[in-house]
């Protein structure tokens, strides 16, 4: 039974990864090979004319991306770098702040905690068009337009509610007995959070980071 489950997982993993592998292979093809009706997926360095499933790998596609295109001011790699920097920093900020906030809601008796959690979640209910004008006016006032910092603040604020709710569920599953034993040994709350909660919440933080990164990247 275990082998059957493992086989099913491998089968679905191959189906999920195959399009990514095909895209990666196609990026090294020439224009003629990429639009060929024959599925050419095996690279070869043979100088003779290839046929069938073989193709000559080339880096022309990546060279074209290094130049500005379609009236753009910069190359594709410049925009890719900006997206990566903004996405990574906003993800780290959202997961860090969300984990700290979730720990407070999970372990302390906060008056009106349910209302506060609903308020945090309700920030995702608003359609983007409802906040475009206020955000634009605020960014103009503080000169945050067309800046990395402005986008990082925006994406962090947008993903913070998701981070809080996801991390609260993960932290709730961590037994409080670990913290009680640490308190008896003289640990402070900060040491408990850093040495006990965070290491056990790493899987949840990883999942949350994936969601936040996808959200920031798609924007």
Predicted regions and their residues:
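A structural signal for multi-pass alpha-helical bundles of membrane permease subunits
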Residues: 2-219
């Amino acid at each position: 039974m275990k082998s059957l489950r493992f086989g099913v997982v491998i089968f679905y993993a191959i189906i999920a990864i195959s399009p990514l592998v095909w895209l990666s292979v196609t990026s090294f093809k020439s224009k003629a090979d990429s639009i060929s009706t024959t599925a050419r997926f095996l690279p070869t360095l043979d100088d003779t004319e290839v046929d069938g499933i073989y193709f000559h790998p080339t880096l022309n596609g990546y060279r074209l991306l290094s130049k500005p295109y379609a009236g753009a001011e910069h190359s594709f790699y410049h925009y890719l770098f900006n997206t990566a920097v903004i996405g990574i920093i906003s993800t780290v900020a959202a997961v860090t702040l969300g984990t700290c906030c979730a720990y407070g809601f999970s372990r302390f008796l906060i008056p009106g905690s349910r209302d506060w959690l609903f308020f945090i979640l309700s920030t995702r209910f608003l359609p983007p068009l409802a906040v475009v004008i206020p955000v634009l006016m605020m960014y103009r006032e503080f000169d945050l337009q067309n800046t990395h910092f402005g986008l990082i603040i925006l994406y962090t604020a947008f993903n913070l509610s998701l981070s809080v709710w996801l991390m609260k569920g993960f932290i709730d599953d961590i037994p409080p007995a670990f913290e009680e034993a640490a308190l008896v040994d003289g640990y402070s709350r900060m040491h408990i959070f850093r040495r006990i909660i965070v290491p056990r919440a790493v899987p949840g933080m990883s999942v949350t980071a994936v969601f936040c990164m996808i959200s920031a990247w798609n924007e």
